[in-house]
Design a protein with these regions (language model features):
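Positively charged, low-complexity/disordered segments
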Residues: 1-10
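ATP-dependent carboxylate-amine ligase
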Residues: 9-130
């Protein structure tokens, strides 16, 4: 709902978002649109690209973004780099939403599962900042 959208934009000023490869392409446009509307800054990144080019997936997400919101977007294909960048530019009292991986502790690239954990990356990055 609009109320939930407004509340989310007040809380999650910065987001890291990705869409999976080999999935519904139409949802990528919606994800790009929603994430850009609900953030002051959003980084589009990879999230299990599987056999697709991660840059093409991000391009699909960008295609769903209104022109007025395009200045909010940064695309960083490398998910670790995206999380580190978002952590470094976050301001005190910002809440950073890193969406997509959830409980998964891997990235699927081509047919390989590569160890990857958003929480570990965030923890390491924040420890280095102290």
């Amino acid at each position: 709902t609009h109320r939930q959208s407004s509340a989310a934009s007040d809380v999650y000023k910065r987001q890291v978002v990705g869409c999976g490869g080999g999935r519904d392409r139409a949802k990528r446009l919606k994800m790009g649109s929603i994430a850009s509307r609900l953030s002051q800054k959003v980084i589009f990144t990879s999230d299990n690209p599987r056999d697709e080019d991660p840059k093409s997936i991000i391009d699909d997400m960008i295609a769903g973004v209104d022109d007025a919101d395009k200045s909010k977007i940064l695309n960083i294909v490398d998910r670790k780099e995206a999380i580190v960048k978002a952590s470094k530019v976050a301001k005190p009292n910002d809440i950073l939403l890193v969406a997509g991986k959830g409980h998964e502790k891997y990235q699927i690239i081509k047919s390989k599962k590569i160890r990857f954990n958003d929480k570990e990356i965030l923890t390491q990055t924040l420890k280095m900042a102290v």
